[in-house]
Amino acid sequence: MKDSLKPGLTYQFKYEVPEDKTVPFLYPEAPELQQMPKVLATGFMVGLFEWTCIQAVNPHIDWPDEQTVGIGINLNHLAATPPGLTVNVEVKLEEVDGRRLVFSIVADDGIDTISKGTHERFIIDAAKFNARVADKRK
């Protein structure tokens, strides 16, 4: 972790929603989801927020030896976004507590605010983390 990783860090990311990030594609094997509207799925939205936070942090850690993993999410999904619209995600690093990072998140699709919330990540040593995961497979 570098000294530049401090509260107040902001980052913005834009992402055009493709059809394969809509609700029916979240779990293609789930027949119930196949009947749902083709709008950005909350699960994919969470992934987009994680991706944005990763991009925000990576210049400030020893990537790829250090990485961050999600440990908490608290958000509202406020409006539906159809494919073709661009989601603008703005994150702000609110707190650095050792290796724990807390971000505030606001996202819009150019028409509506689609989400507000917080996301927590934890800085890991990638080699040690991957070794522990491999041990679970044994």
What are these regions (language model features)?
Residues 39-47:
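Short, conserved micro-motifs enriched in small and acidic residues
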Residues 12-18, 76, 120-122:
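Generic structural detector for well-ordered beta-strands
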Residues 83, 92-138:
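HotDog/MaoC-like acyl-thioester-processing domains
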Residues 5-7, 67, 83, 97:
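A generic structural micro-feature
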Residues 2-40:
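Catalytic strand-loop segment that frames the active site of acyl-thioester-processing enzymes
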Residues 53-88:
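Hydrophobic beta-strand-centered segment that forms part of the acyl-chain substrate-binding groove
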